[in-house]
Regions:
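Hydrophobic, lipid-facing residues on alpha-helical transmembrane segments of integral membrane proteins
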Residues: 113-125, 207, 211-215
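Aromatic-anchored segments of alpha-helical transmembrane domains
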Residues: 45-49, 117-125, 183-196
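Hydrophobic alpha-helical transmembrane segments
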Residues: 84-104, 160-162
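Membrane-helix interfacial "entry" motifs
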Residues: 30, 70-77, 81, 100, ...
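Interfacial segments of alpha-helical transmembrane regions
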Residues: 32-39, 94-122
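N-terminal transmembrane-helix/juxtamembrane module of multi-pass inner/ER membrane proteins
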Residues: 2-91, 127-145
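Structural signal for the C-terminal ends of transmembrane alpha-helices
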Residues: 21-24, 98-107, 168-173, 215-221
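Membrane-embedded catalytic cores of phosphoryl/pyrophosphoryl-handling enzymes
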Residues: 139-230
Length: 230
């Protein structure tokens, strides 16, 4: 008695369903609270520095810091001039938007463009309310290595440098992130050393840049998506 031959399954193999790509997790509560703290801190810095700057004088700690940095030796002129040119307000923002758009980082390009418009609009309004002149118009013993007659508070260089560094942060390799943060203090020191800004000018510009990015991060999810921020 012979056993029946085992039946082989000739049906076509079933295709396994492709695994769905993992969904990107929404910002955690800790991250959201960090941006809330950043927004409140930026408002405090901006209001405090604007109130002090509105008397159109340099005195106390600000005056001491200004002379300490502005009196640094002339051999630092070219490094600080290069740092100032690299952070040249509007042009660096336009360059970043173009580069990120060409690299198909459309969301980042849109974020930088929107933050630049918001930052410059805020800077323009506050600058004309505070109406603080540049250090050469406030002091007699200034090393004015670069001449600029526009109003000084807040610094547009400080604002745009802060905006770009914070927006690029999550797109950079981890090893470059902390190094990139050095751009902000390097730019701030260069503006004071060159005699174009007082210390509170760059503090005010930093506060505006931080505040603009914080507001963008704290917008409701649907609004961020409709604005193409997410």
């Amino acid at each position: 008695m012979t056993r029946p031959a085992a039946q082989t399954d000739t049906s076509p193999p079933q295709q396994t369903e492709a695994a769905a790509p993992p969904k990107q997790s929404l910002p955690t509560k800790a991250v959201r609270w960090w941006w809330i703290v950043a927004l409140l801190g930026s408002l405090g810095l901006l209001i405090g520095s604007a109130l002090v700057a509105s008397d159109h004088q340099l005195h106390g700690v600000e005056l001491t810091f200004f002379h300490a940095i502005n009196n640094w030796p002339d051999r630092l002129y070219y490094p600080f001039l290069a740092a100032s040119i690299v952070s040249e307000s509007l042009w660096i923002a336009v360059a970043v938007v173009i580069v990120t758009f060409v690299a198909k980082l459309y969301r980042l390009a849109w974020q930088v463009a929107a933050a630049t418009v918001a930052g410059y609009g805020t800077t323009f309004i506050i600058r004309h309310f505070v109406a603080r002149p540049r250090p050469p118009q406030l002091l007699t013993d200034v090393h004015a290595r670069v001449h600029d007659t526009a109003l000084g508070f807040p610094s547009g260089h400080a604002m745009i440098s802060t905006v770009i560094v914070l927006l690029l942060w999550s797109y950079l390799p981890r090893g470059w992130r902390w190094l990139t943060l050095l751009i902000i203090p390097a730019m701030a020191l260069s503006r004071v050393y060159l005699g174009t800004h007082a210390p509170l000018d760059v503090v005010g510009g930093f506060a505006i840049g931080l505040g603009v990015v914080a507001v963008m991060r704290l917008l409701p999810l649907r609004l961020r998506q409709s604005l193409r921020f997410d």
